[in-house]
């Protein structure tokens, strides 16, 4: 049985590990949950360890391993989570052993998710982001345009920095859990580490969503679909516009 804060912390740690391969710092965890001190994070991690959801790796700084994620999760009136104890994934799909797995919010987002949706967590805050149009997860399409509308997303997705949203079009990233029609939440940046899923602007004309790989002086934009080929460009042909931090999926 998990408390709401334990569940949210476990979700945050799992998301960060899948995005970057590195556990968040205690300060980052404290800020993400809105706590005033790191002692509260220590207590939450201890509780997750005792319940078999989390493991601290010895002799390594900031080393946490998510052992399992709860399924069929609901909260009772006291904020306790009722879990059937099975090692199932948090967001309803298979838990990958490696590779990128973005945070996915299912359903059309509103500040409070209906109880019939998964995960059944109440998001009390939202933030409005500019929706810049469509981006290809396939063959690059037209470059990013000025915002024509906006969309509300959970505030926990956009901690720090400038963010925007794009509608995914194409299926070249499906093996990373990124589907055509998903709404991508992107943090604006012009640098990214190898393996990061980025928004890339090619030849100042076409935008695409791919995994970044640096190969010597060249830049490779790598799909997550065996039917597509990796595209390699000179460093002066590709500009990083941002990195993917989350997805919103409608059904």
Curated annotation (Swiss-Prot):
The record marks 137-138 as: Cleavage. The active site is at 172 (for autocatalytic cleavage activity), 210 (for autocatalytic cleavage activity). CDD domains: S24_LexA-like. Residues 26-46 bind DNA. Its EC number is 3.4.21.88. GO terms for molecular function: DNA binding; serine-type endopeptidase activity. It comes from the Bacteria. Keywords: Autocatalytic cleavage, DNA damage, DNA repair, DNA replication, DNA-binding, Hydrolase, Repressor, SOS response, Transcription, Transcription regulation. The keyword Ubl conjugation does not apply. It catalyses: Hydrolysis of Ala-|-Gly bond in repressor LexA. GO terms for biological process: DNA repair; DNA replication; negative regulation of DNA-templated transcription; proteolysis; SOS response. SUPFAM superfamilies: LexA/Signal peptidase (SSF51306), Winged helix' DNA-binding domain (SSF46785). NCBIfam families: lexA (TIGR00498). Homodimer. Represses a number of genes involved in the response to DNA damage (SOS response), including recA and lexA. In the presence of single-stranded DNA, RecA interacts with LexA causing an autocatalytic cleavage which disrupts the DNA-binding part of LexA, leading to derepression of the SOS regulon and eventually DNA repair. Belongs to the peptidase S24 family. HAMAP family: LexA (MF_00015). This is LexA repressor. It comes from Rhodospirillum rubrum (strain ATCC 11170 / ATH 1.1.1 / DSM 467 / LMG 4362 / NCIMB 8255 / S1).
């Amino acid at each position: 049985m998990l408390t709401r804060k334990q569940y949210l912390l476990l979700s945050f740690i799992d998301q960060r590990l899948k995005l970057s391969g590195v556990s968040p710092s205690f300060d980052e965890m404290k800020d993400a949950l809105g706590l005033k001190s790191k002692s509260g994070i220590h207590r939450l991690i201890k509780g997750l360890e005792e319940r078999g959801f989390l493991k601290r790796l010895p002799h390594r700084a900031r080393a946490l391993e998510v052992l399992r994620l709860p399924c069929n999760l609901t909260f009772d009136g006291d904020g306790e989570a009722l879990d059937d104890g099975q090692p199932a994934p948090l967001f309803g799909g298979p838990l990958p052993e490696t590779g990128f797995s973005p945070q996915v919010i299912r359903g059309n987002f509103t500040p409070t998710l209906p109880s019939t949706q998964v995960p059944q967590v109440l998001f009390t805050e939202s933030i409005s982001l500019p929706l810049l149009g469509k981006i290809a997860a396939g063959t690059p399409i037209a470059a990013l345009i000025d915002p024509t509308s906006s969309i509300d997303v959970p505030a926990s997705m956009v901690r720090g920095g400038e963010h925007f949203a794009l509608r995914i079009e194409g299926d070249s990233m499906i093996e990373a859990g990124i589907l055509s029609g998903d709404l991508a939440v992107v943090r604006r940046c012009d640098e990214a580490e190898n393996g990061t899923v980025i928004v890339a602007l090619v030849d100042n004309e076409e935008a695409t969503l791919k995994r970044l790989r640096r190969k010597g002086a060249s830049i490779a934009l790598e799909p997550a679909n065996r039917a597509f080929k990796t595209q390699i460009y000179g460093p002066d042909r590709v500009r990083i516009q941002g990195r993917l931090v989350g997805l919103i999926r409608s059904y």
